[in-house]
Regions:
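Catalytic-site neighborhood detector that most strongly recognizes the C-terminal catalytic loop/helix
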Residues: 9, 17, 75-79, 169-186
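Conserved tyrosine-mediated DNA breakage-rejoining catalytic core shared by Y-recombinases
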Residues: 2-5, 50, 60-96
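Short, basic (Lys/Arg/His-rich) helix/loop patches that form interaction surfaces
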Residues: 28-35, 126-167
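Short, polar N-cap/turn motifs at the start of nucleic acid-interacting alpha helices
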Residues: 64-72, 138-140, 160-179
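Short, contiguous acidic/charged loop-to-helix segments that flank catalytic cores in large enzymes
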Residues: 31-34, 72-82, 112-121, 140-143
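Active-site/catalytic core of tyrosine-dependent DNA strand-transfer enzymes
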Residues: 17-24, 87-139
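Basic, Lys/Arg- and aromatic-enriched nucleic-acid-binding interface segment
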Residues: 2-55
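Acidic donor-binding helix in nucleotide-sugar-dependent glycosyltransferases
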Residues: 56-57, 164
Length: 186
């Protein structure tokens, strides 16, 4: 077919998600002897709590984004604005890390930190998450993408409106979101 290679905006690959039980197993792991794994888990859980927020968006979050019990930010990829209620469990994660930059998380130290820094860190976190996933006896490799897919999957199960899921994922249409949800495998 002549249009076989035309990209329609969403790759039709199976997107793997994990259920609430698996998330609980990840949370319950004792990682006190493995700070690097604990950090990777924190990033994963925070992404999950922040509606599957991407690693790059998390990297650029600052204290200015937090106001009146809400986190408000603009997605780097789409410019879409998101407003998420800030929960105690998110604060607990943030409080573990030093406050020596304007950023909420110890990912970037300044604006000049380039894509390479973020890419390298993202790779390392995914490598560590795979180990966390194995320790939690997950049936799939744990990655940052799994947080995004799992949030969407759980939101769908809880019958959260498609429009809300669509906004959170930064999709430009609900049709895109419906296609995305149909590719989720839990």
């Amino acid at each position: 077919a002549p249009f076989q290679s035309v990209y329609t905006g969403i790759a039709q690959t199976v997107k793997r998600a994990i259920d609430i039980d698996s998330i609980k197993r990840i949370k319950d792991l004792d990682l006190s002897l493995y700070p690097h794994l604990s950090y990777a888990r924190d990033i994963f859980l925070l992404s999950l709590g922040l509606r599957g927020m991407s690693f790059i968006d998390m990297a650029y979050l600052t204290y200015d984004n937090l106001q009146g019990g809400h986190l408000t930010y603009y997605r780097r990829k789409t410019g879409g604005r998101l407003d998420i209620r800030w929960e105690q469990q998110m604060q607990t994660i943030i409080d573990k890390y030093p406050k020596d930059t304007k950023y909420l998380l110890p990912i970037l130290t300044n604006e000049a930190d380039d894509r390479q820094t973020y890419k390298k860190l993202s790779k390392r976190i995914n490598r560590h998450l795979r180990l966390v996933g194995e320790m939690a006896q997950l049936s799939i490799p744990l990655t940052l993408y799994v947080a995004r897919h799992s949030w969407a999957s759980i939101a769908k199960q809880k019958q959260i409106p498609i429009s809300v899921i669509s906004d959170a994922l930064g999709h430009d249409s609900e049709k895109t979101t419906l296609i995305y949800l149909s590719t989720l495998d839990t």
